[in-house]
Amino acid sequence: MDREQQILTLIRQNPFISQHEMASIIGISRSAVAGYIAALTKKGTIRGRAYVTSDENTVMCIGGANLDSKATSKQAIRLASSNPVTVTESCGGVARNIAETLAGLACQAALLTVVGDDKAGQWVLEETRKRGVDVSQAIVLQGENTGTYTALLDATGEMFLAFANMDIYDKCTPALLRDKWPHVASAKLIIADTNLPAETLAELIDRCKEENLPLFIDPVSSEKAKKLPQDLHGVTAIFPNWEEACQLAGIAPSSSSSSDYSTIAGAIRARGVRHVFITLGSQGVIYAGEEGERHFPPIPTKVVEVTGAGDAFVAGIAYGVMRQSTYMESCMYGLTASHITLQTDQSVASELTEERLQQTLLHLTKGDESQ
């Protein structure tokens, strides 16, 4: 191991290590350590304060990490009445789900989020860590409650109603983002959801534009999409469903039809987004961006449950982009990841591995996918 690699190893183990400590461990002078650090900084291998290393393989996911509760009705839902259900609890949150999915696809994923100093927060972080996600930048806030998401699904697995308690994400301030920026900027790709406050989203987009950092945005919902600034230059790709896309385009969903797909996508692109993916559920996906326009038909799927399918779609596209695929090529990874997830009752499908993704896509390409 050469000197530069020795120094990088020590810095990765402890970003706050002093030059004197490194010199003592390696057995060279402090001035020699300083010289190596200067060279590494010039190369861009380390950057920012605390010797943050530049990891060209990491995806930094910023946003929600919740405790998810799902109640699935055993029969047709009756309003104003007691309905028999089965209840499950799991880790959730859009950013967290995307990070875990990427980890399952053999990508290096990191999560920047906030949780409360409660059992839910402790459990969410520990479970996320166990599943291969770097949660070292997650912040535990004293006196706060971890975000919760409660969904009611009908007997077919379709969402009927959901409740969200996300007040804790108001604490994800621009100041917090600045404090964590060296770690954010060191990633190869940044993915954020709109659980972040409007001012934090605006600063994130501006900084990614200024520093030419690739940024994906998941709008989460049409209401939360309103938090995005009008100027979206700095957003590399965005992934709205139809309702969210109409909101971003400033057009009421009720006034739109299939003939408006190109118009809606064009209006979003006019705000500065380079690649737009509009998910249409059973109608597939519309792509519009620097690579042209295309409609991707849906993959025939026996749907068990829809929760998490959108997060898997974003993760699949990120997987493709990280492996140098075009955005159109990456859309097939996204559709395949969603296809696999829809066939499970998990928000993050344990079956969704890199091998399964590649094999399923190969079968689909050959036209012999039997699922």
Which residue stretches match the model-derived regions?
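Glycine- and other small-residue-rich loops at beta-strand/loop junctions that grip anionic moieties
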Residues: 26, 113, 192-194, 217
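Glycine-rich phosphate/adenosyl-contacting loop at the front of the ribokinase-like
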Residues: 3, 7-12, 17-25, 29-112, ...
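Conserved N-terminal subdomain of the carbohydrate kinase-like
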Residues: 55-56, 78-85, 104-188, 358-371
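Conserved phosphate/ATP/ADP-binding segment of small-molecule kinases
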Residues: 205, 209-293
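Conserved phosphate-binding/catalytic region of the ribokinase-like
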Residues: 1-19, 25-54, 256-371
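Structural motif
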Residues: 58-59, 69, 188-189, 237, ...
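Short gly/ser/thr-rich secondary-structure transition/capping motifs
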Residues: 42-45, 170-175, 217-223
